[in-house]
Regions:
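Bacterial N-terminal signal peptides
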Residues: 4-15
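Noncatalytic, solvent-exposed loop/strand surfaces
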Residues: 17-409
Length: 409
C-alpha cells in the first residue's frame, strides 16, 4: 500500500478534503502522494497546457488546491521598499484570479536568501479556512472568499527569510519558529481565534531551520515530528510535550519535510554535512544512541524532501543526484544524475514519480530498484516551488506564472 498511516492523521484530524484536493504542502498526506489517475506524463510550453497565468509579486510558496481554487502567497513591492504579503487564489478550471488580499505587511524587509524570500511557506486549507504564513512576518486565517478572520505574529530572527509551512491538526494550527541566536520554538494556535494554545521552546543550543512538521500515528498515539537545528523532535501535538528527540552535530538551516513509513521517520539533517537518518519512532527521551536504524551521507538532500513509494525511498539532492535506497535498511539500489539543480520536493501520482528542477525541467521515472526515464518536460522560467496535483491536472508555479497542465481529452 503506497500511503502509510500518516495519511489517516491528516485526513481524519485536519479537514474533509476529498480525493480531488491538494490542501497542504506535499498533498493530502503531507508525503507527496496523489491518488489521481490520468495525470499527464508529457508537457511543454506548447503541449498539454490548459492555462498559464501571470502571478503578481514574488514568492516560492507551493500551490494548494481545494474547493475549485488554487491558493498561493506572494510578496508585492510597494513604495519605499515595503512589501505587501498577500494571499492569492485562482479558479482551478479557468485560471481567473478570484482572491488577492493583503494578509500581512513588512515596511522594512531585511535580507532574505535568493532561494527564499518573504512568501515561501505554503498555505494550508482546512474546512472553510485558508491559513497563510509568512514566518516571523505574521500568520493569518482567511475565509475561502478571502476575508481575513484573524492575524497573529511571533517575532524571531529568521536570517534567510520565511520558510517552514504550518500544519492543521484538529483545531490547532502548528508551526516551527527556528531563528538565529537560540530563538527557537514551536507554537500551536487555535484555528478559530488565532490565540496561542501551547508553545514549546527548543532545547539549547538551537539555530535557524525552515522545516514543516508532520503528524504521524505510532501505536495508539499521534506524534508531531518537528525538525530543528541540531535535533529532531517528536512532540505530543495536543500539548507540545516532548516524546523523543534525536541529535545530529552539524545540522542546521534544515528545509526538507520529514517522511514516515515502515516505523521509521526519515530526517534530513540540513546544512554543513547533509545526512539522511532513519529513526525508529517508538522511543522515549534521547534516542540518539538507540533508535537510528541507518544513515545516508552520499547524495543526501539539503532542500528537497524525500519521497517513499512502497519499500523504496527516493531522494534527489540539490545538485540533481537521485539516490534510491531500501527504506528499511538504507541499502543503495542506484544513483543517477538527473541534471539541473533541485529545491522542489518530488511527487508520486498515477504510478510515476515526478522530479522538478529549478530550471523548469521535470523528469518522470517509474518506481523500482532500477532507474528508468519515462519523460523529460520543460517549461520556461525558474521552478523552486513544489507541484500540486488535483483533478487529474498538475499545477506548477514558476517565478512568473502559474500553470495548469492536463492531458488533452
Amino acid at each position: 500500500m503506497w500511503v502509510h498511516r500518516v495519511a489517516l492523521v491528516f485526513l481524519l484530524c485536519a479537514s474533509s478534503a476529498d480525493a480531488q484536493d491538494w490542501p497542504q504542502f506535499r498533498g493530502p498526506t503531507g508525503q507527496g502522494h496523489s491518488d489521481e489517475r490520468g495525470v499527464p506524463l508529457n508537457w511543454s510550453e506548447q503541449n498539454n497546457i490548459a492555462w498559464k497565468v501571470p502571478v503578481p509579486g514574488a514568492g516560492w510558496s507551493s500551490p494548494v488546491v481545494a474547493g475549485g481554487r488554487v491558493w498561493m502567497t506572494t510578496a508585492v513591492p510597494e513604495a519605499r521598499g515595503a512589501l505587501s504579503l498577500r494571499a492569492i487564489a485562482f479558479d482551478a478550471q479557468t485560471g481567473r484570479e478570484v482572491v488577492n488580499v493583503e494578509a500581512a505587511r513588512v515596511d522594512r524587509p531585511g535580507y532574505a536568501h535568493f532561494k527564499n524570500g518573504r512568501a515561501s511557506p505554503t498555505p494550508v486549507i482546512a474546512g472553510d479556512r485558508v491559513y497563510v504564513h509568512f514566518g516571523a512576518d505574521g500568520t493569518a486565517a482567511l475565509t475561502t472568499s478571502g476575508e481575513v478572520v484573524w492575524r497573529a505574529r511571533y517575532r524571531y530572527d529568521s536570517q534567510h527569510g520565511s520558510g517552514g509551512t504550518p500544519i492543521v491538526y484538529g483545531d490547532l494550527l502548528i508551526f516551527n519558529c527556528d531563528g538565529n541566536y537560540q530563538e527557537a520554538f514551536v507554537v500551536a494556535l487555535d484555528t478559530r481565534t488565532g490565540k496561542q494554545r501551547w508553545k514549546t521552546q527548543r532545547r539549547q543550543p538551537a539555530d535557524q531551520a525552515y522545516t514543516t512538521p508532520l503528524v504521524i500515528r505510532v501505536g495508539e498515539r499521534d506524534q508531531l515530528i518537528s525538525i530543528g537545528a541540531y535535533r529532531a523532535y517528536a512532540y505530543d501535538p495536543m500539548t507540545g510535550k516532548e516524546i523523543w528527540r534525536v541529535s545530529y552535530d552539524d545540522g542546521f538551516s534544515n528545509v526538507p519535510r520529514p517522511v514516515y513509513g515502515h516505523g521509521l521517520v526519515f530526517i534530513a539533517t540540513g546544512f554543513q554535512q547533509p545526512t539522511l537518518i532513519a529513526v525508529r519512532a517508538d522511543g522515549q527521551g534521547d534516542v540518539t544512541r538507540t533508535h537510528i536504524a541507518w544513515t545516508l551521507t552520499r547524495g543526501a538532500p539539503f532542500t528537497p524532501s524525500p519521497i517513499l513509494v512502497g519499500d523504496e525511498l527516493y531522494v534527489v539532492n540539490d545538485t540533481g543526484i537521485l539516490t534510491t535506497v531500501d527504506a528499511r535498511t538504507g541499502t543503495i539500489h542506484y544513483q543517477q544524475r538527473l541534471g539541473g539543480n533541485y529545491s522542489a520536493s518530488p511527487v508520486f501520482a498515477d504510478g510515476r514519480i515526478y522530479f522538478q528542477s529549478e530550471e523548469g525541467v521535470t523528469t518522470v521515472i517509474p518506481p523500482g530498484r532500477q532507474f528508468g526515464r519515462l519523460a523529460t518536460n520543460r517549461l520556461d522560467g525558474a521552478t523552486l516551488a513544489s507541484m500540486a496535483i488535483a483533478g487529474a491536472a498538475i499545477f506548477i508555479r514558476s517565478d512568473s506564472h502559474l500553470y495548469r497542465i492536463q492531458a488533452a481529452r
